[in-house]
Amino acid sequence: MGSEMCIRDRLNSFLKSAVSASFNRITVDGDTSTNDAVTLSATGQSGIEITAGSQHAEHYEQALTTLMIELAQDIVRDGEGASKFVEIRVTGGESEAACDQVARTVAHSPLVKTALFASDPNWGRILAAIGRAGLEDLDTDAVSIHLNGVLIAEQGARAASYTEEKGKEAMASEDLLIEIALNRGDAGAVIWTTDLSYDYVRINAEYRT
């Protein structure tokens, strides 16, 4: 990415902040590439100087982060064989790192990803992934899970209000939001990922080096 602003010392901090909120929030299958990179340059040709603490700096950082989030989500939507775009939002954690750990464990679970491909609101697989995320003293009875606004699990089991009709309706969209409330703190984290389809297996099985 490039800019004509005169930024100087703040350019690297802007980039790190925006990448943390965007490209570092995505995963398709848990693997990372050896040659992925994000670059940001500023030529200064506009003559507009971005100084620390200024309104220009705040607006620039917000715009840069918004742009990078859009680009990062486009990468997920274009994932190999992806048929669903999935946002996993974890709240109520003791720290952002703990919430991130839960979100990534769910996002990387083959059982969760294949259930999403099958449009199966399988709360058991999601809860199992949460349970193996490695959080100490996690009370699964305190965890609740919503899928596209539908409560599917609470108190360690299927929600009493849940019906198959509600689950089917929630899974109808190509964009899915999984909300996981840990109810043990005030921190949160979000990860964007995909389902795991037949085409993902085919594409990667047919690709030979």
Report each predicted region and the residues it spans.
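Internal helix-turn-beta structural module
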Residues: 100-101, 108, 112-209
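Glycine-rich, charged/polar anion/phosphate-binding loops
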Residues: 19-28, 70-76, 128-131, 161-166, ...
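Short, small-residue-biased leader/transition segments that mark boundaries at the very start
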Residues: 1-7
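A glycine- and small/hydrophobic-rich beta-loop-beta segment
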Residues: 44-118
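Acidic, glycine-rich loop-and-beta core segments that form the ion-binding/anion-interacting portion
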Residues: 11-71
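Flexible, glycine/charged-enriched surface loops at secondary-structure junctions
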Residues: 23-35, 70-87, 113-120, 137-142, ...
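Beta-strand segments within the central parallel beta-sheet cores of soluble alpha/beta enzyme folds
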Residues: 12-16, 39, 84-89, 141-147
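Gly/Ser/Thr-rich beta-alpha loop segments that engage phosphate groups in nucleotides
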Residues: 4, 32, 46, 120, ...
